[in-house]
UniProtKB/Swiss-Prot annotation:
It comes from Pyrrhocoris apterus. The keyword Zinc-finger does not apply. Coiled coil: none annotated. One of its GO terms (cellular component) is extracellular region. This is Pyrrhocoricin. Glycans are attached at residue 11. Its main location: secreted. Antibacterial peptide. Affects Gram-negative bacteria E.coli 1106, P.aeruginosa, E.coli D22 and E.cloacae and Gram-positive bacteria M.luteus and B.subtilis.
Length: 20
């Protein structure tokens, strides 16, 4: 779920939402 990558998920703070 890339659309939910910017959401507070139980994952490390990586710039997933910052990728073009």
């Amino acid at each position: 779920v890339d659309k939910g990558s910017y959401l507070p998920r139980p994952t490390p703070p990586r710039p997933i939402y910052n990728r073009n």
